[in-house]
């Protein structure tokens, strides 16, 4: 995946090329950078996203999907890569556990209830 800009060529990752939902990118950013709730609210405001509405539901959904994606990737990588298997397996376990614990909370269904 390449971008040509002012005569220069840049190699980019596909998931960060803007082809995915902005909510996946935003959810992944918050997850990977451990964004606190107050910081997330500031970002929502700056990005003109709807707090407490469908925008927040989509953010929640993609945050969990991002964690599951990374968890499955790391687990697979840990099984296949014998040199670093423990690190990747631990990362996979952490990411999948995050989703598992979220699914088992009382408000999980409410977090994913679209209003439209």
What is the predicted function of each stretch?
Residues 1-24:
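Active-site acidic catalytic loop and adjacent metal/ATP-binding pocket
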Residues 22-52, 64-82, 98:
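Active-site activation/catalytic loop segments of kinase-like enzymes and analogous catalytic loops
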